[in-house]
């Protein structure tokens, strides 16, 4: 009986540690942070917006940044 209780407590501790590690890995990306590799990790009320980058007519990348929701950026000419 003691062995069953001890085994249950050990399993509970292991599961708790695994859940704590998962939560610590969920740190959000702040405003203007780069989110190309993890677009779903921007902080609350912030979106991950991406744009295509071209150099001499050739696409050279797709950078993404966490920006405020409902904000539209326009190019200055």
Curated annotation (Swiss-Prot):
Its post-translational modification remark reads: Contains 4 disulfide bonds.
For this UniProt record, give its keywords in alphabetical order, as a comma-separated list: Disulfide bond, Secreted, Signal, Toxin
Reading the lineage from the top rank, the first entry is Eukaryota
InterPro entries (alphabetical): Spider_toxin_CSTX_knottin, Spidertoxin
As for subcellular location, the record says: Secreted
Its cellular-component GO annotations read: extracellular region
Q: Quick check: keyword Secreted in the entry?
A: yes
What's a single GO MF annotation on this record? ion channel inhibitor activity
| Pfam families xrefs | Toxin_35
Q: Which residues form the signal peptide?
A: 1-20
Provide the tissue specificity: Expressed by the venom gland.
Propiece residues: 21-26
The entry's family comment says: Belongs to the neurotoxin 19 (CSTX) family. 09 (U10-Lctx) subfamily.
Q: Could you tell me what this protein is called? A: U10-lycotoxin-Ls1a
What is the species of this protein?
Lycosa singoriensis
């Amino acid at each position: 009986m003691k062995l069953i209780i001890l085994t249950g407590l050990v399993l509970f501790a292991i599961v708790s540690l695994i859940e704590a590690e998962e939560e610590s890995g969920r740190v959000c990306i702040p405003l203007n942070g780069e989110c190309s590799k993890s677009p779903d990790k921007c902080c609350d009320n912030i979106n991950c917006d991406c744009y295509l980058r071209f150099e001499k007519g050739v696409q050279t990348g797709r950078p993404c940044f966490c920006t405020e929701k409902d904000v539209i950026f326009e190019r200055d000419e």
